[in-house]
């Protein structure tokens, strides 16, 4: 992706996130169970499976702790694969974006620098306005976290987001560095 195109359309950031998201599915809690030929079999080393499961459990626990509505928490086990892909997809897209812009910095537009616009585009891509009833329904049935948590559940675990927005202890979505999740 050229710096020129990134400067012209924030849509490319969200496209990068979606492509990264789909790539990560090949290595999430379900995709990792299939080998290069698409056959379902365990092909990882036992030590890698153990480390993966340990870290994946931390993601499930993090999302389980999110109170979506009074008396209703997210289901981190149900949404695990999608949450891993959301988090990983943003990181893949961020690295691609930084690589594409390293020799051609982008300008500040509307008071936001290019790095800030990257993360704002990620958030904007999941913007939605749904009813409480739909929130309840999706929380209990959908393998995807609610759109709000696809953003607010992923970004606070990405160091670049902290640096980009100068997020500090005491800020609403702040998570101490040692508690941030990182699967890869």
Region locations from a protein language model:
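Single conserved hydrophobic/aromatic residue that forms the stacking wall/gate
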Residues: 1-7
């Amino acid at each position: 992706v050229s710096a020129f195109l990134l400067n012209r359309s924030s849509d490319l950031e969200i496209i990068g996130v979606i492509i990264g998201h789909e790539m990560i599915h090949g290595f999430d809690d379900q995709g990792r169970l299939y080998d290069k030929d698409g056959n379902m079999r365990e092909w990882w080393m036992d030590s890698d499976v153990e480390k993966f499961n340990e870290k994946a459990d931390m993601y499930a626990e993090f999302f389980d702790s999110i109170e979506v509505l009074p008396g209703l928490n997210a289901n981190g086990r149900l949404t695990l694969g999608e949450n891993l892909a959301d988090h990983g997809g943003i990181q893949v897209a961020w690295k691609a974006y930084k690589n594409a812009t390293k020799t051609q910095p982008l300008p500040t537009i509307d008071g936001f620098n290019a790095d800030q616009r990257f993360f704002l585009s990620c958030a904007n891509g999941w913007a939605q306005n749904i009813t409480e009833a739909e929130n309840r329904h999706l929380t209990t049935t959908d393998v995807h976290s609610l759109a709000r948590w696809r953003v607010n559940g992923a970004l606070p675990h990405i160091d670049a987001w902290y640096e980009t927005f100068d997020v500090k202890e005491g800020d609403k979505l702040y998570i101490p560095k040692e508690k941030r999740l990182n699967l890869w």
